[in-house]
Amino acid sequence: MKPTHTALIAMLLMSGPALADGGVSVPLPDTSGMPAAEAKALMSELAQVNVITSNCPDYALDDEDWTLITGTGDRLAAQLGLSAGDYDREFYGPAFKLLDDPQACDRIGPTAAPLIERLKSMGGGTTPTTASQ
């Protein structure tokens, strides 16, 4: 990927609402002043909740909640200058390993709602701002 494309993608991820594959867009929290260590801890939590809620039917999320979680993780990755490969390796690799633990769904799944509330308290939201036509 050309450097200008990478910079453009990073700018898009760091500004405005996030758009889900289904066309749902939600406002993302302001993470611009978050220290790197705190951002990485939040990214780990976001990846774990994303993997568990996507793979454990009892804890499935709606499109708006999912978009808030994934959009925030993407924004933080861009903020920290992580490539897609580094982001997957550092955060999603360990999160997917949780699926080997039969207790992971019931341990991580209930943390989704408090995480979403935390993101809302930081300025994020789950009310769609646009929808696909």
Question: Where are the language model's segments positioned?
Answer:
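Bacterial N-terminal signal peptides that target proteins for export
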Residues: 1-7
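Hydrophobic helical h-region of N-terminal Sec-dependent signal peptides
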Residues: 8-13
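N-terminal signal peptide c-region/cleavage motif recognized by signal peptidases
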Residues: 15-17
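Short N-proximal segments of mature Sec-exported proteins
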Residues: 26-82
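Compact alpha-helical subdomains of small soluble proteins
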Residues: 27-28, 64-133
